[in-house]
Amino acid sequence: MVQVLNAQGELGKEDIRSNYVTFLASLFRSMRFSAADAHGRANIAAFNFLQRMGAFTRDSATGRYRVDFDKFRAGSDSLAATILKFQGDGDYAGVGEFQKSFGVVTALAQADLARLAALKIPVDVIFDQGQP
């Protein structure tokens, strides 16, 4: 979907690959603070789906993630098609099976989340507007 906006020039001169990297980072961020709500579970499923599609890999020595841009595009297209099909068909049971397959934080991802928590990186920024 973002590829269409990019092809139409709606994203300016930005390299489309930065959108893929940002999306992956946002999935990881979401898993840190909202794994229990619907938004968090959807992002966990997206993360696991894209990982299974080879959209990114994790270096076991460093714990760092690397995006495969071609596979990320194919994976995100496949994820969007899967979700749209579930919605269009009203396939509630299919969504349940999808969530069973992809909607769980893996032990490896949980270890990476714990590593982030140990670094005390803030989960969210709070902005107070106006006078106290």
Label for each model-derived stretch:
Residues 3-99:
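Long, well-structured alpha-helical subdomains associated
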